[in-house]
Amino acid sequence: MGFARLLHLVFSLLVFAGITNGLICPFDSIYQLGDSFSDTGNLIRLPPDGPTFTAAHFPYGETFPGTPTGRCSDGRLIIDFIATALNLPLLNPYLQQNVSFRHGVNFAVAGATALDRSFLAARGVQVSDIHSHLSAQLNWFRTYLGSICSTPKECSNKLKNALFILGNIGNNDVNYAFPNRTIEEIRAYVPFITEAVANATREIIRLGGSRVIVPGIFPIGCVARNLNFLNFFPDGDKDDLGCLSSLNNLSIYFNSLFQRALASLSIEFPQAVIIYADYYNAWRFLFRNGPALGSNSTSLLKCCCGIGGPYNYDPDRECGSRGVPVCPNPTQYIQWDGTHFTQAAYRRVAEYVIPGIIKALKCSYSNIQPFLREGEGRQALRLNERE
């Protein structure tokens, strides 16, 4: 039996056998906060420059739905697959007008940071005004909440069957600083980033949320945008996957603080279910096993949409720019544009993390839509696989 067939068999047993002692998930809505890995169309609606953002134009959205939506990919994101798995419609962005928010709202904004702009500016890190940071997204949520309930009790009742996803967020706080700040300088303010996310999680619970997923950040040393800065790192900094160890170690440090903060919150709010989603190891597993899962073995660190250099990435000629080509088959690529990933990659990461999330929420798999039966990405990733 081939490796990919074995992976698919193991995952199918996990998902479709069900957890007989679990409870049916009662979710009727999802609320998402985050950055470009979750934004389904907010940034492109933010004046004055949002409509000029690359994700507002083709080839973004070419795989799904066939036209740009503001998603930073050729198609769906992890949040889309989570919604589908829970039998809920895809989330509409908060800034989209004349749409239904009956089943939740997406407040995520591409480029958003966990820390406020003033904090980063004081440390010499410049962030555009257009990118709504985490506290601004929380303000949007408060405004929205005020439109559907008027008392704490009523709000708690409205949110009792809601799932909150906070992130991933925080990698932009690092990306905007790099390479103008050293790894040591960035590492020094990572605790402030994780504290900001923990405080946002605390606020969501105080406002009535009872089930919150907080994903860790991905291995930032594996994305083409950062690999393009290879000259800033000493020789030998690459690991066996070709990723930058210094940056990935920063992700590991970041995620360790995340998990510590969430453990403290679980003690502070014993009535809430707070889940850490291990995006880091999901992406590492995908990069390591990409060829067995359908990715082209020569393109694991290369962009599908891009041009130039060893990673098919040029920061001065972004995806969507005139003359920048797109690969003929995005399902064979993990990386989309140098910073973001393809729909096929997001699907596989979703397949990795969703079973663990559902188990932690004490839900039955029998209520989970088998999205992985559709289209590409049918090979599955084992739950909690470690290198």
From Swiss-Prot:
Listed A to Z, the keywords are: Alkaloid metabolism, Glycoprotein, Hydrolase, Signal
In the UniProt record, does the keyword Glycoprotein occur?
yes
Residues carrying a glycan: 98, 180, 199, 249, 296
This protein's superkingdom?
Eukaryota
- Where would one find the signal peptide in this protein? 1-22
- Write down the CDD domains for this protein, in alphabetical order: SGNH_plant_lipase_like
Q: How does activity depend on pH?
A: Optimum pH is 8.0. Half maximum activity is seen at pH 6.5 and 9.8.
GO BP annotation list: alkaloid metabolic process
Q: In which pathway does it act?
A: Alkaloid biosynthesis; ajmaline biosynthesis
- The active site lies at 36 (nucleophile), 337, 340
Q: Name one GO molecular function term.
A: acetylajmaline esterase activity
Describe, from the UniProt record, how activity changes with temperature.
Optimum temperature is 53 degrees Celsius.
Q: Which reaction is recorded as catalysed by this protein?
A: 17-O-acetylajmaline + H2O = ajmaline + acetate + H(+); 17-O-acetylnorajmaline + H2O = norajmaline + acetate + H(+)
- EC annotation from Swiss-Prot or TrEMBL: 3.1.1.80
Provide the top EC class.
hydrolase
**Does the UniProt entry include the keyword Thylakoid?**
no
Family named by the database record: Belongs to the 'GDSL' lipolytic enzyme family.
Protein purpose: Acetylesterase involved in the biosynthesis of ajmaline-type monoterpenoid indole alkaloids (MIAs) natural products, important plant-derived pharmaceuticals used in the therapy of heart disorders. Deacetylates 17-O-acetylajmaline and 17-O-acetylnorajmaline to produce ajmaline and norajmaline, but is inactive toward other acetylated alkaloids.
What is this protein identified as? Acetylajmalan esterase
Cite the source lineage: Eukaryota, Viridiplantae, Streptophyta, Embryophyta, Tracheophyta
Gene encoding the protein: AAE
